[in-house]
């Protein structure tokens, strides 16, 4: 009986020993799987981080506003008159030549500014695109409506016409209806006095009279404030400037042949004359070089 009991004890101990070894093996196997899973997860995370790092390295930052200019720089304010061919008359530019110039501006990324925008640029330092120009027309010829206006509309350009108010509806000048249509469609109408007087030759009282009367005539016709003027012949002196300011104008242009900048004075801004004799190369020079006359 004792032998039987001893034999049973030996068998039981043997079975217990085998069970422990299998359990240990199972735990070790699970540990390896777990470790392998952690390593794979870690590698995947590392790869993701690396991938993210590469992505962040390739993100392009927004460019600086290098394509803007401020009022420490100048701007070409272009001066036209009639858009119509006339032999040996530099004040009149042929339609084909005008369109060639406007197409060049459009194709080369130029922005046209209103006089409101020019004022904000010079007086309030509001930035504008580097390649900006201002288009102005003196006197108020009918061909500004018949020839220039369709081209300006085609390219989406802004412009300003300085109108001699006594000429409205006469001869080769713009009619009241044409002025209203132009004003409503991005072509600003401003003053060029009543009779195109040489302001520096008038008494102070006469200066005030023509400056105020032309302003009032246009304001009544167009139902808007008239704030800008072009001096006839470009003539002015200190008395003209004082009368212009006293009459309520905020900005005035002359015929001096350089770019406008804040050093000119807001009531004596320069302009760039575009002659009917100028070829495209000369036009390019004038809109790209502030001191093109030197």
Regions found by a protein language model. Name each.
Residues 162, 192, 252-254:
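Short beta-strand and adjacent tight-turn residues that come in two discontinuous sequence segments
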Residues 141-142, 195:
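Short, glycine/acidic-enriched loop or turn micro-motifs at the edges of active sites
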Residues 168-172:
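Active-site glycine- and acidic-residue-rich loops that bind
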Residues 149-157, 174-191, 246:
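Acidic (Asp/Glu)-rich catalytic clusters
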Residues 1-24:
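Sec-dependent N-terminal signal peptides of Gram-positive bacterial secreted proteins and lipoproteins
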Residues 78-79, 188-196, 232:
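Histidine-centered catalytic micro-motifs
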Residues 18-44:
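Signal peptide processing junction and immediate N-terminal pro/mature segment
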Residues 32, 40, 47-136, 142-143, ...:
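C-terminal active-site subregion of NodB/CE4 polysaccharide deacetylases
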């Amino acid at each position: 009986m004792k032998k039987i009991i001893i034999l049973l004890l030996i068998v039981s101990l043997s079975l217990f020993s085998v069970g422990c070894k299998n359990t240990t093996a199972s735990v070790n196997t699970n540990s390896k799987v777990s470790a392998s899973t952690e390593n794979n997860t870690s590698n995947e995370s590392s790869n993701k981080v690396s991938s993210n790092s590469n992505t962040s390295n390739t993100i392009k930052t927004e460019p600086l506003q290098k394509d803007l200019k401020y009022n420490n720089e100048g701007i070409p304010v272009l001066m036209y008159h009639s858009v119509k061919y006339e032999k040996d008359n530099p004040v009149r530019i042929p339609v084909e030549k005008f369109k060639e110039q406007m197409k060049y501006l459009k194709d080369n990324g130029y922005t046209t500014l209103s006089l409101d925008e020019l004022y904000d640029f010079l007086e309030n330092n509001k930035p504008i695109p580097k390649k900006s120009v201002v288009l102005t027309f003196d006197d108020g010829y009918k061909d500004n409506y018949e020839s220039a206006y369709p081209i300006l509309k085609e390219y989406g350009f802004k412009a300003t016409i300085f109108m001699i108010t006594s000429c409205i509806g006469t001869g080769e000048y713009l009619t009241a209806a044409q002025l209203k249509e132009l004003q409503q469609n991005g072509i600003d109408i401003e003053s060029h006095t009543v009779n195109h007087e040489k302001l520096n030759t008038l008494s102070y009282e006469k200066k005030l009279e023509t400056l105020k009367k032309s302003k009032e005539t246009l304001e009544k016709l167009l139902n808007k404030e008239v704030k800008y003027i072009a001096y006839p012949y470009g003539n002015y002196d200190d008395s003209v400037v004082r009368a212009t300011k006293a009459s309520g104008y905020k900005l005035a242009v002359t015929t001096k042949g350089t770019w406008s900048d804040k050093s000119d004075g807001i009531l004596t801004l320069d302009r760039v004359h575009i002659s009917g004799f100028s070829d495209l190369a000369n036009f390019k020079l004038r809109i790209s070089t502030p001191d093109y006359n030197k």
